[in-house]
């Protein structure tokens, strides 16, 4: 029974039934929309005069998965230049990371500020 159905389908594809409107004989395939990469956002830490450097290193290790050496380097950039990029992510992830850092800083009673900026 199954083989018979396959043969019929093949036959019907070669010769459309009378009720099908296929008079042009042209095969049409719908085009797929072009996919674009989502816009990326930088997560930026800002310097302040009160947050301890060790706390900034802890934040970078905890929320951005950095090792101690890289976290210390980024912390020193924040300290000397006033700001540093911690990572570049899609908008939802960047917003979540910035919110988590700001919430953790407030819970720890530090004024550390983390924001996002559109990359590019």
From Swiss-Prot:
Transmembrane segments: none
GO biological process, one term: protein catabolic process
InterPro entries from the UniProt entry: ClpS, ClpS_core, Ribosomal_bL12_C/ClpS-like
SUPFAM superfamilies: ClpS-like
Record region (Disordered): 9-32
Family indicated by similarity: Belongs to the ClpS family.
Oligomer and partners: Binds to the N-terminal domain of the chaperone ClpA.
PANTHER family in the cross-refs: ATP-DEPENDENT CLP PROTEASE ADAPTER PROTEIN CLPS, ATP-DEPENDENT CLP PROTEASE ADAPTER PROTEIN CLPS1, CHLOROPLASTIC
Free-text function comment from the UniProt entry: Involved in the modulation of the specificity of the ClpAP-mediated ATP-dependent protein degradation.
Protein name per Swiss-Prot or TrEMBL: ATP-dependent Clp protease adapter protein ClpS
Lineage, opening ranks: Bacteria, Pseudomonadati, Pseudomonadota, Gammaproteobacteria, Pseudomonadales
